[in-house]
Amino acid sequence: MDIFRHTFGNNDDSFIRIPGAFREEPPADLNGRTEDQNSNTNEPTQSRDGRLKSILHFLFQAPLIVLYYLLNFIVRSSRLLKPLLRLHGFYQRKHNRLLDHSSQLHRLLENLENEAQAVTCSEGNGNNDDGSNTDSTSNNESSGVQFSFGSLYNPENGTFSKSIMQNSYTELLDACSEQVKFGVIYLHDPLLDNHMDYVNKILCSEAFVNMIRKYQVLLWYGDVTTSEGLQVSNALKIRQYPLLGIISLKAEKKIELIARVEGSISNYKAQDLEAIFSKNYSRLIQLRQQRQNIEMQRLIRQQQDSRYQDSLRRDQQRESERLEQTQREQMEREHQRIENQWLLWRKSQLKPEPSSDKDASKVAIRLENGQRLVRKFDASLPTEEIYAFVELQLHDMLNSENDTLPVYQPANYQHQYSFKLITPVPRRELDLSTKISDVSGIYPSGNIVMERLDE
């Protein structure tokens, strides 16, 4: 609070009178009045200034005090909430790990493997203390321990690692339905005194291992102290623990619990379990054959449909090609008809050969087959007249008698010559629109060579 007092308080230095000192006379002003007389005069003004300063002091001091305590509260609250948030995050991560069946399974199998090794070591040490190797062998045979738990059920390199369902109980049901196989459920209770009896005397026994191999059984392990293990236990209506249950596909996509061993290990008999597997295995074989037959029929239908679609596609392609060929032939015939009509019309428009040499051009035309034609043309006509003459000669229409009937020029048809006419010296192609008289190579006379255009 000293800072507020220093900010808004009186800036005058405090004065303490020394005891026994003489009374100091107040100094007089220029008019001869003392300070007391002046103070009496200025007292109303100082009173107003003091009240104004007090009001300003209160207005500025109160918000700053509130802000100070508010910031102090926020800082202290954040320090208290930080450990709580860390604790909440820890329990949240732990809860998420517990919900993951894969992590639960790995932890359960690891614990069972360690405890099984501990039991084996303790039994071996006890037998060595007694000095009897024969008793150790007899105890192992009586207990039925033929394999180590880790060599069988280790999720990474165990014999049955691929048969153990890594995910939820629902995955086991789906796998049994899709693959048409038996499923074995083992619910472990670590709170029991003899909770390792099932592990050592059943799960690791030679008889049980042989049954798992023979019938290609899928395995699912759970812990009743977890939420999923407890849900499975309630769904199967288990009364005692541990549980060894067998599920099988009884009908299409209908899974049933066909056998169970609960509680004391004395309730377990390997021959009874073998009888249950053997009895229901024939039913699974039938279901597998039905599935295979259905799948085979589906594949046959699929192949038939595929062959039918291929045949239909080939027929459609052949029909499409036939239609295209027909259309091309029709278009070619129509084009040939129009071209013949144009040739007849062009023959009717062809000017006769001039009788005199005046204003005429005498040219010698050599065709592609070596034939040589000599003819006179009117020099005032364009060179297209020579092109038309050669075209009619190639179609053998100059000497035909089909020009007796009137022929009209085809509408919307522009004839394209399939050759070009060239003067050899100098070598130059004749332009269709140029007058014959303007071409020095053929007027008044000259030679022309016909060449086919590249298609």
UniProtKB/Swiss-Prot annotation:
The keyword Cytoplasm applies. Residues 25-48, 120-142, 305-332 are annotated as: Disordered. One of its GO terms (cellular component) is endoplasmic reticulum. GO terms for molecular function: clathrin binding; ubiquitin binding. One of its GO terms (biological process) is clathrin-dependent endocytosis. Its main location: cytoplasm. Residues 122-142 have a biased composition (Low complexity). Residues 356-455 form the UBX domain. Keywords: Cytoplasm, Ubl conjugation pathway. The keyword Cytoplasm applies. Pfam families: UBX. Residues 25-36, 307-332 have a biased composition (Basic and acidic residues). It is found in: Cytoplasm. Component of the DSC E3 ubiquitin ligase complexes that tag proteins present in Golgi, endosome and vacuole membranes and function in protein homeostasis under non-stress conditions and support a role in protein quality control. Involved in CDC48-dependent protein degradation through the ubiquitin/proteasome pathway. Involved in delivery of substrates to the 26S proteasome. Also required for membrane fusion. Component of the DSC E3 ligase complexes composed of at least TUL1, DSC2, DSC3, UBX3, CDC48 as well as VLD1 for the vacuole-localized complex or GLD1 for the Golgi/endosome-localized complex. Interacts with CDC48. Present with 233 molecules/cell in log phase SD medium. This is UBX domain-containing protein 3. It comes from Saccharomyces cerevisiae (strain ATCC 204508 / S288c) (Baker's yeast).
